[in-house]
Amino acid sequence: MSDGGSAPARRRVCSALAACGVSPLALVLTLILTLVSGCSKPPAPLPNDAYIWQRKWTPSVTSAIAQSSGFVQTWHVLAAEKDSKDDWTLISPDWATLAATRAPVTAVVRIDGQLGDLTTLPIARIVKLADDWKQHGITLAAIEIDHDCATSRLAGYTRFLATLRAQLDPAIKLTITALPAWLGSPALDALLAHADEAVLQVHAVMNPAQGLFDPTQARAWLREFAQHTKHPWRVALPTYGTRVTWGDDGRVAGIESERPMLLANGFAQGVAHELVAQPEQISAFVTRIERDALPGLTGIVWFRLPTDADDRAWSLGTWRAVLTRAPLIAAISADAHQSAQQPGLFDVSLVSGGNTDAPLPAVIRTDASCEAADGINGYALDYDAHGMLLRRVQPGLLRAGMRRDIGWLRCGGVDNKKVSVRVEP
């Protein structure tokens, strides 16, 4: 084994360092500091904002705000809507609940993307809205314009923003919602230059194969967007699912995401798909973009605030776990329990343990010999070489701690204790 060199050699090295005015100890310390500085620090978590998109502030909304106030930096609150018929609707928040959070508020004005002439919009009304909101004991940080216009109309949108910015209180920031579809437009840079901040929306209904959120595509959009703006910006990420019906012509016939809808020519005649934002997928995406540290990216805006009454959003517990970057643990099991009314009839249920809403399993199987069965709530009866099973026909999430009935079994000739069901991925 080597002893690290002879004594004369070590003396020659020390003499050379001394001649240069460098002590061996200083050299060692320099090397250590270089190695330490070369180690990358863990990325700082991006701050969490959230959209309150509910038009009616029900007890479930105010309760969700109260339970989430410690995890949210800024609330983006739907304040007004201008629809395609040129009607103007104001939303009335629960001011006491909003003020109690002590968090900054961004008032969002949604302008229908089909409005072609923005010069007719009452800018004075938006300015007055900002003044009115400041009278309710909240900290109004910004006005956000949500206008999903066609790329060909960005120049007109830019002129509208310039006029609004000139009339808005300089202490209030002007921010906009930006779309990935705009990234190829030469008018985008000018548009973003007239806004103090922007929120890039990377979730949308595009086609059933892509789903509601594509992390690879979203990350590419973020990298490209960072090259177009010199102002701070955030990314909007989904906490919800949506049911989309596609017509025979391949176009979207109906979307059910914020509340149930009955469409006479939609769900009955088209092909429906349940598109779901998976908590594990979104959580992994957040970890990735925090490592990317893209220029100007200052936070996440979650769309939308989950509530106990919102069946199409994550549970509050799952959302908080994602907000705090906690490990997500999904655990779904199945059980069969005998009906109290009919001997031999067993109800089949899924039970979600863990701390996160979990994707519905693809197959539920039983080894019992049953005469009949059927599925409900996203499941249907099917058969394969191994026998009877309940197969998932619509994807979805089962909230943490919740139970869902998915079907029944009629097994009259079987010992009740031997009827069991199991989950197959």
Please report, for each region that a protein language model flagged, where it lies by residue:
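Catalytic domains of carbohydrate-active enzymes, especially glycoside hydrolases
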Residues: T58-S84, H136-L140
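Short, well-ordered beta-strand segments enriched in hydrophobic/aromatic residues
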Residues: G344-G353
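Substrate-binding cleft of secreted/luminal carbohydrate-active enzymes
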Residues: D248-P327
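Conserved, mostly hydrophobic/aromatic
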Residues: W75, I145, A198, V235, ...
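Chitinase-like catalytic core of GlcNAc-active glycosidases
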Residues: P43-P45, A80-E197
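C-terminal motif of bacterial Sec signal peptides marking the signal peptidase cleavage site
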Residues: V36-G38
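Substrate-binding surface in catalytic domains of secreted glycosidases
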Residues: A155, R159-P260, V271
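C-terminal beta-sandwich/jelly-roll accessory domains of carbohydrate-active enzymes
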Residues: Q338, G353-P425
